[in-house]
Amino acid sequence: MSFYNHKEIEPKWQGYWAEHHTFKTGTDASKPKFYALDMFPYPSGAGLHVGHPEGYTATDILSRYKRAQGYNVLHPMGWDAFGLPAEQYAMDTGNDPAEFTAENIANFKRQINALGFSYDWDREVNTTDPNYYKWTQWIFTKLYEKGLAYEAEVPVNWVEELGTAIANEEVLPDGTSERGGYPVVRKPMRQWMLKITAYAERLLNDLDELDWSESIKDMQRNWIGKSTGANVTFKVKGTDKEFTVFTTRPDTLFGATFTVLAPEHELVDAITSTEQAEAVADYKHQASLKSDLARTDLAKEKTGVWTGAYAINPVNGKEIPIWIADYVLASYGTGAVMAVPAHDQRDWEFAKQFDLPIVEVLEGGNVEEAAYTEDGLHVNSDFLDGLNKEDAIAKIVACLEEKGCGQEKVTYRLRDWLFSRQRYWGEPIPIIHWEDGTSTAVPESELPLVLPVTKDIRPSGTGESPLANLTDWLEVTREDGVKGRRETNTMPQWAGSSWYYLRYIDPHNTEKLADEDLLKQWLPVDIYVGGAEHAVLHLLYARFWHKFLYDLGVVPTKEPFQKLFNQGMILGTSYRDHRGALVATDKVEKRDGSFFHVETGEELEQAPAKMSKSLKNVVNPDDVVEQYGADTLRVYEMFMGPLDASIAWSEEGLEGSRKFLDRVYRLITSKEIIAENNGALDKVYNETVKAVTEQIESLKFNTAIAQLMVFVNAANKEDKLYVDYAKGFIQLIAPFAPHLAEELWQTVAATGESISYVAWPTWDESKLVEDEIEIVVQIKGKVRAKLMVAKDLSREELQEIALADEKVKVEIDGKEIVKVISVPNKLVNIVVK
């Protein structure tokens, strides 16, 4: 057979690996460890798409490489299986979300195994398994005991169509929900919160210790949003009331000409005048219909209403109006701002809109035309006049502190984590509310608090989850006869994914989350590969929980993931019409190398776009494996380009990768394998071992494959192939194309055992030395010839060779040689006249 028969070979080796537990995690304490982690998937009904295997193949290459290098490798897989999609599907179809999820997991697992990934399935976790979420609930009870889980009446992002509140991070820029694209409104509700803000400074500072891309670290820094400034207290004229604003520029207080409160601010109703009451009430209602993102959009028209009240500027005693406006959020800072329109563009636009005063306090701009937002010396600022920014801030803060109306303050943009969901399909929150007004956590001995089975899973719409309908489960009685109700909210999908990497380390432990010695052995995760879309949410939450567990003494490291790598996106093929609108692939036909709209006949432009059901350009890996084989898919996705680049899917590229594997198969099965080394491939073989090793280490898989191709080309030019080089090459390609490598290994090594633990090949540095080198020959400073010569020739030998060259002879014929300058290994310069 002259080609790689993937339909026979791939199932054969997948069966072998499963039967022999080839990838069971090593436990030899004398070996170094390597923990390669994938972001575990949500098992959707659609199954895997070709984007999933890109990251999975990368960690699989590293895992196979490290096993061959003698490491104990932990390379697990599991399922992030709670969450809205399964519940939504169950409501739409009448199916049980647990059954639907189990079917999806079985399909995902089948697809993953068909791709030849070397996971240790003995460590599989599933966030919906009570034996798993027992420990999710345990972590929650510890947070509760430490005061880091608490209940609060807060304005939440309510999604009527989903029947639940969602976190700020789950609201899209257009004000709709990330899940489903439904409208989001603000609504006050009793919610469980996690005090992630208590860890803000540590979450910020410890980023410096991580091997993550700066772009991801910056996204987290910006989300945490540390600001240094001052709290300033404003008294409300004619009342005993006051409010505090946080500002990073207290030095501009003399330019504050009005203040703005969030519509939800607790003072609004108390200070609003009778004349303004109706307008304020209407505005508050309108603001409640908008998401935070929609309210804070810089481009939107400025809206607001005067309350009828005035504040007293603490530095000059001036009365300034108090407005409400939706761009101020009750959940951010103090829910109040001092407006300095001369030096803040949003305040300037607001002042212009409502004809409010603009007072310049920093020189350098024309504040009638626009806000001046650069630094400048202070003016119109009494005792601050003539000072720069730093000196003025120090002086004004000292003044405020002396007067008792302000103080230096550090704040964070980060808000506490909204942790409850009004849905069924999630981990029950292990809290009981007693009729005497107290609440207690469910004791550890009673965990897991199992999610009860019910067909009635539609949200109540009242703010309570469907669990509120299950009386037998809901109502409990204490030993002393006091009655109570279980918490009916469930945890968000982020809960189970915030610690799953710890459970992989000891997945069957019934006594604790994981054994301390095993956690010491395996943490931190050596490399974590997944999409950049999780930069803020999942990664920030996981870091928070990890730091909390570190404080409890459960985990031995401050950070969970030492190295993070975000793979790029695999784009689908799509088509655009003359208006730039995307056209679904089933509406396109190809004629004479061009693409046309089936219905209109318009010629279309081919363009890459994100794979989507609507464009009908999603590529199913099952189809690729059937036609080309898993190894082809693996090699193609790694050869497409740099791992972090977003690149369009190409059928031609897939065919090219398949042809390469066929060439590899023919090279090993057709070439005469010899026991004696004739030296012909010494240099290219050792170059290949070195390059592939170094490029796997640096995740440059595309260039590693390119070097493997160089070797195949060189080897095909020879009649015979040295057996050790054949073996070494098969080992080098094994992480990329493991099924093919296993099969070829048996043809040259015939051990009957897997290649997986055969020691990784090494290179001989002496074989990399160039025997020949190119020199240039110059005549009167101009290059006239380039010659290949033996390395390290003397000046005299170089001169002799250069003068004997036919081209050089022609150039110097009939001329007098004045001088010859020779530089070994570089050049010969002949001076003539």
Curated annotation (Swiss-Prot):
Residues noted as binding ATP in the record, renumbered to the chain: K613
Keyword tags: Aminoacyl-tRNA synthetase, ATP-binding, Cytoplasm, Ligase, Nucleotide-binding, Protein biosynthesis
One MF term in the entry's GO annotations: aminoacyl-tRNA deacylase activity
Cysteine-cysteine disulfides: none
Subcellular localization(s) per the UniProt record: Cytoplasm
One of the Pfam families matching this protein, by short name: Anticodon_1
First-tier enzyme category under EC: ligase
Main location: cytoplasm
Motif ('HIGH' region): 41-52
Bilayer-crossing regions: none
Enzyme Commission number(s) from the entry: 6.1.1.4
GO CC terms: cytosol
UniProt motif 'KMSKS' region: location: 610-614
Annotated GO biological process: leucyl-tRNA aminoacylation
Catalytic activity, as annotated: tRNA(Leu) + L-leucine + ATP = L-leucyl-tRNA(Leu) + AMP + diphosphate
UniProt key word Transcription: no
Gene3D superfamilies: HUPs, Isoleucyl-tRNA Synthetase, Domain 1, Valyl/Leucyl/Isoleucyl-tRNA synthetase, editing domain
PANTHER family listed in its UniProt record: LEUCINE--TRNA LIGASE, MITOCHONDRIAL (PTHR43740:SF2), LEUCYL-TRNA SYNTHETASE (PTHR43740)
HAMAP family in UniProt: Leu_tRNA_synth_B
Recorded family membership: Belongs to the class-I aminoacyl-tRNA synthetase family.
Record's protein name: Leucine--tRNA ligase
Organism whose genome encodes this protein: Streptococcus pneumoniae (strain P1031)
